[in-house]
């Protein structure tokens, strides 16, 4: 038996699991058993320190994942069965040399994560979204859905407040773009953020949300809470609830948006629109809640419009032209994110919705990528009414003239 497993077994034999066990007590028992084992097996000081940490993590934390969770350079952790762990650093994927001791240990960690988020995961409910205490987002898939063993994906979020300046430092966009985004938020433009999986939609949503004036009443709606708004006292956070084992007590995004509208919000922020709740979000934007923000999966600003149209049709039989009219009056600006060739997350496109043209939603490009892969200003905002109404017009005039279009 490996020393780690031997130590773990002896520690567990010493503990009384019928009583609450503090971290301090557990660490004391581990240290005591390490001293005993070192009398049987010669151990270096470095071995004792390593065993102490590994056994504590195995019994109280998330085992081999704990070091990765505490490593700020790791942004994503992917577990494909107990033997295969991959991590993302600076947009690049790497295979992690460590792995779980066996399938049983992986399942223990999965159940620990799920129960900590009040989620149930089993064969009857094999796909679960959850979050860790630090806000990291977790997706779990169990066999037989996951053919080669249980999988768990953990998307971490920065511990420091995510601001537009923070994103500038990581070269997601320039300071000029950051100033423009702040103006859009301050002037209460309704904004949709689009992008693929892992493109940074939630991170940008966090950064933009932290530009909201501190005296407003904000309601956030998410499937798994991960937004971190700082300095807003009048903040209400709502989270979707999955159905229980009997298929009851579900509270979906559509219901949460309906509840939010009755709670006198200044703005509503929806973490991600995925289905028929898209119509509820459009209604919220159309009924006096200017400055609302949401995100969705799409490949471009134009594709985001098609996606919203499809999502609305998932819940209601409504003429397509009527849906497009709702979008044209509800959404002011769409911001698209993507990944560049080196894997880094970038802001790729900003477009303004200017109304309807020939039964289509009219998109007016404000910023686009040029031939040098740089985000370049193409045009000023057409609708500047909100800029003037909310005192942001002068700030917007500080920008230089738009660049001529590439030929």
For the regions a protein language model found, what residue spans apply to each?
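N-terminal accessory targeting/assembly segments
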Residues: 1-121
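Conserved small/polar residues in nucleotide/adenosyl-binding loops
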Residues: 399-406
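P-loop NTP-binding catalytic core
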Residues: 71, 84-187
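Conserved, well-folded catalytic cores of nucleic-acid-processing
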Residues: 10-17, 36-40, 58-65, 80, ...
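P-loop NTPase nucleotide-binding module
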Residues: 127, 136, 156-158, 163-228, ...
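Switch/coupling sub-region of P-loop NTPases
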Residues: 188-191, 207-330, 336-338
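Switch/connector loops and helix/strand junctions flanking conserved nucleotide-binding motifs
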Residues: 85-88, 227-230, 302-305, 342-348, ...
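Conserved P-loop NTPase
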Residues: 328-398
